[in-house]
């Protein structure tokens, strides 16, 4: 992976793609999925330690857009979940991302769910995970991203600790927000991960309104103290029925959140029913999520009528996939699974195809 990143930085994208497809990916896919993820993160951290940061400014393809009051170098970002602890923001930034979303982090470190908890559905270019917000805690993330060289936009995705009662969830989100506020260009409130017990119930309009009111009141207090208002986005599930989706969208807009991210992973297995791994519990992402997430974006866009922007994520493997989500109503898009299946070169490939 480190060699692939270096080749991309030197402009050898074709060679990098071949190296990933024929050497690196087969080697990684021989390993357990979570072990491969850990090895990838180690390689990206090593790439960062080698000083690739000096090349970051000229490695971010420029196609600027303003969203949430922030100037994004381009529309393509890294979705939350890959660099949970912000350990390799500079190295991922070197790939060309206009923004990077780290996390999900919680107030206190937690181990997440028992292993195995990450599965590749290779024939469907998809992934099932039931990680359970494993992370080193919000303070650790802040330490990791302090002093970063990456010049794009940094988002920090926050959540509730598994041991926190649902009725106290607002305290966790507010605590996380306070911890990461100075380090974040924007913050994402994750209320849609299917792998944390009870979390998705927070998307219900009756629960979401008091939660967001608490979080956004805390944001406004911090903004007054620090003289900088950090935008807050809310990440939602693709599994909400249309009425519930629209009700959640109304609450998000009315409470004063700055964007909605559509979508998180799905618990549906309709698109992968023939795969023997489809019976594994967890959230499904990747190509199998593409149509479901795009439809959610289309519904949200028609309902919100540009009141707040939409960030689209789910199954983007090409510039055409990204364009489809933008045409459905997304202002920005994020990728995750395609980076695993196609390698680091996918970033600049998508950006080139988008142009």
What is each PLM-predicted segment?
Residues 70-77, 151-156, 222-240, 303-312:
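Short beta-strand/loop segments at the ligand-binding rim of alpha/beta enzyme cores
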Residues 101-110, 191-193, 259-267, 316, ...:
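Glycine-rich phosphate-binding active-site loops on the catalytic face of alpha/beta enzymes
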Residues 15-66, 129-134, 138:
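An N-cap/entry alpha-helix motif that binds or orients negatively charged groups
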Residues 110-125, 270-282, 338-355:
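C-terminal helical cap(s) of enzyme catalytic domains, especially alpha/beta-barrels
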Residues 103-152:
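A gly/proline- and charged-residue-enriched helix-loop-helix capping module
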Residues 161-174, 201, 207, 233-253:
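Active-site glycine- and acidic-residue-rich loops that bind
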Residues 85-92, 240-254, 306, 316-333:
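Catalytic cores of alpha/beta
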Residues 41, 45-47, 52-58, 194-207, ...:
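Glycine/Thr-rich beta-alpha phosphate-binding loop at enzyme active sites
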């Amino acid at each position: 992976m480190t060699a692939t990143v270096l080749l991309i930085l030197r402009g050898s994208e074709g060679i990098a793609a071949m190296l990933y497809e024929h050497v690196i990916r087969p080697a990684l896919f021989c390993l357990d999925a979570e072990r491969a993820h850990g090895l990838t993160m180690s390689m990206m951290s090593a790439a960062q330690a080698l000083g690739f940061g000096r090349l970051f400014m000229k490695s971010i393809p420029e196609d600027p857009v303003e969203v949430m009051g922030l100037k994004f170098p381009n529309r393509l970002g890294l979705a939350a979940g890959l660099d949970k602890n912000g350990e390799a923001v500079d190295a991922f930034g070197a790939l060309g991302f206009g923004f990077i979303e780290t996390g999900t982090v919680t107030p206190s470190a937690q181990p997440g769910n028992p292993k195995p908890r990450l599965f590749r559905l290779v024939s469907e270019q998809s992934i099932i995970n039931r990680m359970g917000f494993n992370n080193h805690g919000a303070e650790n993330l802040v330490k990791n991203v302090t002093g970063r060289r990456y010049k794009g936009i940094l988002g920090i995705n926050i959540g509730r600790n598994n041991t926190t009662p649902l009725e106290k969830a607002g305290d966790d989100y507010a605590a996380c927000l306070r911890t990461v506020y100075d380090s974040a260009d924007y913050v994402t409130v994750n209320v849609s991960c299917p792998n944390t017990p009870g979390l998705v119930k927070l998307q219900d309009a009756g629960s979401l309104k008091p939660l967001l009111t608490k979080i956004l009141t805390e944001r406004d207090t911090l903004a007054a103290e620090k003289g900088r208002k950090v935008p807050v986005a809310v990440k939602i599930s693709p599994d909400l029925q249309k009425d519930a989706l629209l009700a959640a969208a109304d609450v998000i807009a009315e409470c004063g959140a700055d964007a909605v991210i559509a979508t998180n992973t799905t618990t549906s297995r309709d698109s992968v029913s023939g795969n023997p791994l489809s019976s594994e519990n967890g959230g499904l992402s990747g190509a199998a999520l593409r149509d479901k997430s795009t439809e959610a974006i289309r519904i949200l866009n028609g309902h919100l009528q540009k009141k707040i922007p939409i960030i689209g994520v789910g199954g983007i493997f090409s510039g055409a996939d990204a364009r489809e989500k933008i045409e459905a109503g997304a202002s920005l898009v994020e990728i995750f699974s395609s980076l695993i299946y196609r390698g680091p070169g996918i970033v600049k490939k998508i950006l080139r195809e988008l142009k």
